[in-house]
A protein has these predicted regions:
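Phosphate-binding and adjacent anionic-ligand microenvironments
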Residues: 1-174
Length: 174
């Protein structure tokens, strides 16, 4: 319905690219099934979820339900008469690496000029084939550094560089 899927900012780039290729809009929210559900209700969307596996079918429930998700997936497999592997071939998952950096002041990290310059440099280097996210945890005194790229090696290289800059700026708690 509404040809839109609701997903969080942490969803894999492969999802965004696959949806675009299929002509499906993606409404992006902050992390948390609460925010996914809020966007679904506010806009009349019927399907959304987050990378952690919380998949919401608003016609049936307001929270993620693993059994419901499995049943809905089985319905698609039977309807399309294709294996799950065949159905998934159209989506390339990008390698992704996430590191948590313990900090005293999350806002200071996000607002730090050198951190932002390095983030922009990495983003430019990755281009259309990757991305970097710096996100304040909502539950812990950490900054989450996430990189998606064409290879695990590139993910590690850029995550390590970003963490190094945060440490060099004296923002990390060792």
């Amino acid at each position: 319905q509404n040809n839109t899927v609701v997903a969080t900012i942490m969803s894999n780039m492969g999802l965004f690219k696959a949806m675009k290729r299929e002509g499906i809009e993606v409404c992006v929210t902050t992390v948390g099934d609460k925010y996914v559900n809020e966007a679904m209700v506010a806009n009349g969307y019927v399907f959304g979820g987050e990378q952690s596996g919380h998949i919401i079918f608003s016609k049936h429930a307001t929270t993620g339900d693993g059994i419901l998700t499995a049943l809905m997936l089985m319905e698609v497999i039977l309807e399309k008469k294709q294996s799950l592997g065949t159905l998934c071939k159209g989506m390339q998952m990008y390698p992704q690496l996430l590191k948590n950096v313990r900090v005293e002041d999350k806002a200071a990290v996000i607002g730090n000029a050198r951190v932002q310059v390095e983030k922009d440099r990495i983003s430019t280097a990755l281009g259309e084939d990757g991305r970097i996210l710096l996100r304040e945890s909502g539950t812990e005194p950490v900054i989450r550094v996430m990189v998606e790229a064409q290879s695990d090696e590139l993910c590690a290289k850029y995550v390590d560089k970003m963490v190094q800059v945060i440490r060099e700026e004296g923002l990390a708690v060792e």
